[in-house]
Structures are given as C-alpha cells and as structure tokens.
A protein has these predicted regions:
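N-terminal cofactor/phosphate-binding cores enriched in small/glycine residues
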Residues: 43-126, 133-156, 160-163, 549
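Repeat-blade elements of multi-bladed beta-propeller folds
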Residues: 31-38, 70-89, 112-139, 172-198, ...
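Extracytoplasmic beta-rich repeat domains
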Residues: 65-76, 105-126, 156-181, 221-250, ...
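Phosphate/diphosphate-binding loops
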Residues: 315-364
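Beta-propeller blade signature
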Residues: 143, 203-215, 279-294, 344-347, ...
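Hydrophobic or amphipathic alpha-helical targeting/insertion segments
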Residues: 91, 97, 114-118, 122, ...
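N-terminal pre-domain segments of enzymes
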Residues: 23-50, 370-383, 388-399, 473, ...
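A structural motif specific to WD40 beta-propellers
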Residues: 63, 101-104, 151-152, 217-218, ...
C-alpha cells in the first residue's frame, strides 16, 4: 500500500511547495482548514488531507448534525482557526467544528447569501478577521469573524448598499446569492439583479471594495456604456439600463497573477432578445480582470445573444495543463450546455480549440439569433445534447412511455439539437435544460491525477414562445411558456420526476485536463421505485458539487435520492454511501479538527429547483478511532 500511495504523496509535497512560494497572501492558518467555498482562491476544491482513504472510507459514520432551522441549504461551510461558518435562511452561524455546537449566530432579518460567506484574515493595521455576506435588501454586511458582531466602521454602520453605486433602475432587485471573493484587502462582488421581465433594471457591474472601510475601489461594466469597448455589440441604445449580464455565481482569484475570473449570465430578458439584437457583451462571458484595478485583461464569450438562459453558472477552476513537458497555467469553465472550455489563464487563448458552428435560427418575429455558437474542439459535451423521438424515449413501463409520448404528440414537440430556439406554433425540446448540463456546482480538480470532476444532468426542457396581449412597461413583446404554463418545463413526468429520455439521468464525469478527454463516467443516483425493480444504475437529476482529496477520493451529494457518496477518483468505482434526512443540493467540504480528526461535512437542505423533500441540517462524518488507525 505504501508503494502505491507514494507517487501521489511526492506530487502533493511539490504542489504545496510551489503554492506556498508563489502566494503573496497570508498563508492558511491551519493546513487542514477550508477557507473559502472552493477551499482555495482558485476553487480547486482539493484537500491534501490523507486520513480518509480508499481503504477505510467505507467506515465513515455521522458524528454530528446541526439544525439550521432553514430549508433549501446550498452553502459550503468554511472552517478557519477553530470555527465553522455557514449560512441558512437569514442567519450566519459559527459552530464548533468538532461537535457542531453553536458558538454564535447573526440574524440579518432577511435572507443572506444562500451559498455562504467570504472570509478576510485582517491586515497589518491590526484590523481583525471579518466575514462578508449579502443580505436580500441589496446590501452586504461585514461581521467580526470571532464574535459575529456587525463591524460598524465598515460602510454605513457595517453595511454597504450595493444598489446605490450601480447605475440603472435602483428599484430593481439585487442580491448576492453567492458570496464575494477576497483578494488581498479587496472584497469583490458580483450579484443577482433580475433575469426575467422587465428587461431593464440594475446593471450587473463587478466591483471591488476596500475590505476595511467598505469604500468602492473600482467597477467593471458588464454591460458597456456609451463609448466603451463592446457597446457596439448592442443594437442602438439597447444596452441602457439592461439587467442581467451579471456574475451571480462564484468568482475565482488567481492570487499569484492578481486576476479575478468572473462567469457572467445572460442579459434580460432570458428568453427573448428582439429588443437587444447583437452578441450582447459581456453577457455569457468568462472575464479575467485585474483584481487590484478592475481593468479587463481578457474575455471569452461562450454563448452569443443568449435566449436559452444558459448563464455561465459555475466558478472558473484554476488548473495546470501539461503539454510537451511544459506546465501551462489554465482555467476551466463548465457551462449549462455541459461544454467544458479550457483557457490559458494569462492570455485567454483556448488550449484545445474553439469552433464557431452553425445553430438553428428562431422564427419568432423580431428575434435575431446569432448564426453560430462556440464549441470546444475537445472535450465533447459532457451530457446529452440530442434527442431522437424514434429511439430515445424511456420505455421503462407502458404507463411512463405513454405519458411521455402523449406529452410529445399533444404539444407538437420538436428538437433540432442543442441551441434549438423556442417557436410559436410548437413546443421545442432541448438538451440540456436551464439546470444543465453543468450548474453552479461546477468542478473539482485533482492536481495529482490531472483530472477535473463534475456531476451533470441529462435532463431536457420544453418550451414555446407566446405573444403577450398587454406587455407591462419595459417587458418584451414575447414570453416563454410551457405545457404547464411556466417559463421553463422539464422533460419529465411531473409527478414521479422520472425523465422522458432514456437513462442515465445524472452522471459523475472525470476529464483528463492534459488531453481534454473523458477519463470515465458513471451513473449518479437512484430512483427508489426503479431500484426495487432492479434498475439501480439510472442516475437522477442532481444539483450540488464535488470535492476531491489527495487520497484519490471524490465526494458528492446532489442527487434527489438523499444519498451522499464517495468514489474512486481513478476508476469511478463507488466506495461509500449514506442516506441523509434530505437531499444534499450543496457542495461538501473536509477539514482536520483540533483533535487531529478529518471530517467531511455537507448541507442537506433538499428543496430547490429539483423539488426535493426539504431538510434543515448540516451533517458531519468521520472515521472511528480504530478505523483512523487502520
């Protein structure tokens, strides 16, 4: 066993040495801590801990659970200097990591960032460590990391009004659904500013703030203003007061190069662009900014003129690609379309090529779909992107097959593959859906094995366009609907949530980043009634990400079957699973407590867009002392 593990151990030591030498930020307080949503600023979600191995992971047991009192939990807990931080509902909690005992809590009175908090370690002026999170009133609050008290000398009595420094309709919605990121003494925010109707609202500017005072330091206009580069990609004045085009998901920091990478969403309205003809920069872009000044370094637009709600939903992941013996600093971006793009971190050049391919065009009056869309040459899409009604229906039972066939025939459904636009006279089916493919759960990266891991869905969506009889001011003339009179319909049985397409419905996928080839893929999740009939490799829809460890383990929840699992990073073999009280639509984390015990923690909140049974708990797992010593 020692000989088998030795190569990973040697590589791990070299990685740690190179990272420590390159980083101008303060070093981690404890090696076993998890200091940001992605553990490190580059969102690799990789842990160097080695106590839990392939040989003993089956012995993991629940050691504590903390009830947040809130449902639909999506946050990844942080553990820093002996405290765990997590959000739920309107509350930020600090817990004792060893036991789950509450140390303090801060109740904002309205919803806080549902995906957690950002941590700043303080600075040389003796300003103590702080936490930053959003509040649903459109504000960001700073808390003392030790006590949970509002830091009153930050902003206005501890708060920044994020609406006031953004031009546009200040009455529009604004929220930090995902936590900000921190570079040195700068807190960098994106935000959720409305994606539906009307099309106008607050701009989705990316901004940098002084971590001590809350002073605005810089802004990057995700919708260019008059005279700025990119404004020519908007027809006429359609850029004015345009909402959406925002970094609502996680951002990533390259500390060594002083870069922040931001994935942006689609411009409003999500499903009709007749009032915003053009490519619509910087919508649906991966943007690299100077983290100190906010100046644009480079960008790549991955969807032109989006009318599918195919935001870039996930944190860009910093990786290294080895080519001809040379290590290239790279950044990987998963999309809702399940395409995986890999770029040179410094220049933005695609490392495995990009092709502009013709795509179907819309026949909705006034719409002007872009004639081509970008596809990576490698790897291929990670999820289903086509559907053939002659052979791809799931014929599990006569009843299910009849339900899906009737749905198809009654609503005159059709598909032309990925990027099929919704029409007026029939209902389109396209794969993936607005849930992905990939989503905010994103990637984890194993720098030892040179692979990224992601959980994807093979779930289609159905929709058609409908002309509004009396559109509200600022609303587009056409809106998207479905057989269920919702803007988005899933291509599944509404009662059972079993998709109409053949399985697998959800998968865990590993990609070799040095060759951009799929290393392995396995079904992820089970439907209980199908499992009882012997169909236990169907996978399920899922939402919630992966982490990986130096011992070659991949941990993932996400599925609607309430399971939490561990897989072999090399082969994709499942090594462990447990059943939670609710599905875990969140990304796990792992840390080493003060007693030298490695724990794995996940939020099991259910609910969400997959309509899972709700839960309210943060759950921790560890090995027994006898298993740890084995």
């Amino acid at each position: 066993m020692k000989n088998k593990l030795a190569p990973r151990a040697v590589i791990l030591v070299l990685l740690a040495a190179s990272i420590t030498g390159a980083s101008p930020q303060p070093p981690p307080h404890r090696v076993g801590d998890w200091q940001s949503f992605g553990r490190d600023p580059g969102a690799q979600r990789f842990s160097s801990l080695r106590q839990i191995t392939k040989h003993n992971v089956a012995g993991l047991q629940q050691v504590w659970a903390f009830d947040t009192g809130s449902r639909d939990l999506q946050a990844t807990p942080l553990v820093i200097d002996g405290l765990m931080y997590v959000t739920g509902g309107s509350t930020v909690f600090a817990l004792e990591p060893e036991t789950g005992r509450q140390v303090w809590k801060f109740d904002a009175g309205s919803a806080v960032s549902k995906r957690g908090v950002a941590y700043w370690p303080g600075d040389s002026t003796k300003v103590p460590a702080r936490l930053y999170t959003g509040v649903s009133s459109g504000r960001m609050v700073a808390l003392d990391a030790a006590t949970g008290a509002v830091v009153t000398d930050f902003g206005e009595r501890g708060y920044i009004d994020l609406k006031q420094s953004v031009r546009g309709d200040v009455d529009g919605p604004f929220m930090l659904d995902s936590p900000p990121v921190v570079y040195r003494n700068i807190v960098i925010t994106g935000g959720s500013n409305g994606e539906g109707s009307p099309s106008t609202g607050l701009y989705g500017d990316i901004r940098g703030w002084d971590a001590r005072s809350g002073k605005l330091l810089w802004s990057f206009h995700t919708v260019p203003r008059a005279g700025e580069p990119g404004v020519e990609t908007w027809d006429g004045d359609s850029w004015k007061n345009r909402s959406g085009t925002n970094a609502w998901s996680y951002m990533t920091v390259d500390v060594e190069r002083g870069l922040v990478f931001a994935p942006t969403g689609s411009p409003t309205s999500d499903f009709y662009g007749g009032d915003r003809k053009g490519k619509n920069l910087y919508g649906n872009c991966l943007i690299a900014l100077d983290a100190t000044t906010g100046k644009l370094r480079w960008f790549q637009q991955l969807v032109h003129h989006d009318i599918w709600d195919w935001d870039l939903p996930a944190a860009p992941t910093l990786i290294d690609v080895t080519r001809n013996g040379r290590k290239i600093p790279a950044v990987a971006q998963i999309t809702k379309m399940s395409t995986l793009f890999i770029f040179d971190r410094e220049t933005g050049e695609p490392l495995f090529g990009i092709e502009e391919r013709p795509v179907p065009q819309s026949d909705v009056p006034g719409e002007a779909t872009w004639p081509t869309q970008p596809f990576p040459v490698k790897p291929p899409p990670l999820s289903r992107t086509t559907f053939d009604p002659a052979q791809d229906f799931y014929t599990l039972t006569p009843e299910h097959a009849a339900y899906c066939r009737e749905l198809w025939d009654t609503h005159k459904m059709y598909t032309k593959g990925i990027f099929t636009p919704a029409g007026l006279d029939a209902t389109m089916v396209t794969f993936p859906s607005t849930l992905g493919g990939g989503n905010w759960s994103g990637l984890s990266y194993d720098p030892i094995g040179g692979r990224v891991f992601t959980n994807i869905m093979n779930l289609g969506q159905v929709a058609r366009m409908e002309r509004r009889s009396n559109p509200a001011p600022g609303a587009p003339e056409y809106e998207r609907t479905s057989p269920w009179k919702r803007p988005i319909g899933r291509f599944w049985n509404l009662e059972t949530r079993i998709p109409c397409s053949a399985p697998p419905f959800g998968e865990l996928v590993a990609v070799d980043v040095n060759t951009a080839s799929i290393a392995w893929r396995v079904p992820l999740g089970v439907f209980e009634d199908l499992k009882a009939r012997g169909f236990d490799r169907t996978g399920t829809p899922n939402m919630g990400g992966t982490i990986t460890t130096a011992e070659g383990l991949v941990f993932v929840g996400g599925t609607i079957d309430k399971r939490f699992r561990a897989f072999d990073a090399e082969t994709g073999a499942q090594l462990w699973e447990t059943t939670l009280e609710a599905s875990a639509h969140a990304t796990p984390m792992t840390f080493l407590d003060r007693n030298g015990r490695q724990l794995v923690v996940i939020a099991a909140g259910g609910g969400g867009l997959l309509r899972s049974e709700p839960g309210t708990k943060i759950v921790a797992f560890a090995l027994s002392p006898t298993k740890r010593s084995s």
